[in-house]
Amino acid sequence: MEQFNVWFTVSEVQGLVKSGGLADVAKALPQALKALHQQVAIALPAYRSVPGKEDAELVLETELTHWPHTQYRVLKRDLDGVPIYLIDCPAYFDRPALYAENNQAYADNGERFGFFSAACLDVLPKLGIQPDIIHANDWHTGLVPFLLKTRYRYDSFFEQVKSVLTVHNAIFKGIFSYHQLEVIPELNLSGMEFLQYGHDHVSMLRAGIAFADKVNAVSPNYAAELLTPLGAHGLVDDFVRRARDLHGIVNGCDYSEWNPRTDHYLPATYSDEPESMRKGKALCKTALQEELHLPVTDVPLFGMVCRLTHQKGFHYLLPILEQFLRNNVQVVIVGTGEPEVAARLNKIAHYHRAKFAFVETYSERLAHWVEAGSDFFLMPSEFEACGLNQIYSMAYGTLPIVREVGGLKDTVNDYDKFPERATGFGYQEPTPEALLITMQRALLFYLQQPEEMLKVQQRAMQQNFSWEESAQEYMKMYRLARFG
């Protein structure tokens, strides 16, 4: 097995800073690559909230010319054996949050992450790090492949270096005006007009798609959706242009974090052995009900942990939620996001206190409790590049109810379509009614076929979405990027 030296550039890493699923991937994939004897290091902004900065090793003090804030430092620390290089420029990153405050994005985000992308390349010769592959992620580092092919095109240090871009969510395109990105003169070079998005703006994600040697989406089905107008969110021509270089690789599950046999968050651990699962999940359900002041009773419990956004399908769930609550069920939703969604959920919780609990916060502990204590997990997403919660749910014997988009279609087998290999429930139609029918289908399954449900739960728990397999797929893509 050949060894690649991978420079992983990303805006968040679980265990240091996290706002979403990108951080989970950014921790787990480098670790999986390292376990396969690859050389990997991560570049991350030195946000105020990164723990252990004061104890990190100062490895470089330098400057990036042509920037309003040119001085920056590089701090080095370790995360579970993977070196992390923190790009420390307080003017850009010493702030209370990563991207936004009070639901308002920082006005200079384009400049901030343009700087970070430029610094990710600037530090390599200065630190003597010679990667084979530079791995960019989403719009935040979309300019890394672009700068590699423009600013560093004739630099002998970068002559053999190839880049890949992982698209975790194409709806976030990193659109900023040319004025906001005037610190990157390469964007105004002749022939770069195709990077324009709308009038006088440029998309940092588009730049990455165009200039990376290989591009991947975080599931095969999402890669296929990116080649359609509906799935590409305004970038269909860009993805079609790169169709031969576009790959789909399903995210893995970090089973060291999400494993009901060893989960330190849970009030009771359990395995896929029937008696262990029955007993363990019952204890977890009781603890969840007590925590959320729901009646402690053995009724089917439907859970949901996510951001409160259109993407997560609340425009499908909210119109039918109260109708569904007429059944003898309980529903638990945990998350933060759009104020109007939260307001409606709070109102429903007020009128249905015995059946519905809404917790407007994100808690890692509570997320684990919902995964273990629920019987079903709701994911009626408008779109879902890969999705991780359906994989976590299956690991905990909690059957996912998914709209079959993106990675949800790749990872969950619907009971009605595939009874012999079912791991949950799926549907396709983008309507509240289709969601309600599927939830009712799951409810009847719980009530009428308890032994069959136990078999499906066992099968779900036995699914293996290990990062080792995903990392091997990434290595195949690295090989293609490097050697063709």
From Swiss-Prot:
Top EC category: transferase
Binding residues annotated for ADP-alpha-D-glucose, in chain numbering: 18
The reaction(s) this protein catalyses: [(1->4)-alpha-D-glucosyl](n) + ADP-alpha-D-glucose = [(1->4)-alpha-D-glucosyl](n+1) + ADP + H(+)
Presence of the UniProt keyword Glycosyltransferase in the record: yes
Bilayer-spanning residue ranges: none
UniProt entry keywords in alphabetical sequence: Glycogen biosynthesis, Glycosyltransferase, Transferase
GO biological process: glycogen biosynthetic process
E.C. numbers: 2.4.1.21
Pathway annotation from the record: Glycan biosynthesis; glycogen biosynthesis
GO molecular function: alpha-1,4-glucan glucosyltransferase (ADP-glucose donor) activity; alpha-1,4-glucan glucosyltransferase (UDP-glucose donor) activity
Gene Ontology cellular component annotations, sorted alphabetically: cytosol
Family from the record: Belongs to the glycosyltransferase 1 family. Bacterial/plant glycogen synthase subfamily.
UniProt-listed PANTHER family: ALPHA AMYLASE DOMAIN-CONTAINING PROTEIN, GRANULE-BOUND STARCH SYNTHASE 1, CHLOROPLASTIC/AMYLOPLASTIC
Reported function: Synthesizes alpha-1,4-glucan chains using ADP-glucose.
Protein name per the record: Glycogen synthase
Organism listed in the record: Vibrio cholerae serotype O1 (strain ATCC 39315 / El Tor Inaba N16961)
Source species taxonomy: Bacteria, Pseudomonadati, Pseudomonadota, Gammaproteobacteria, Vibrionales
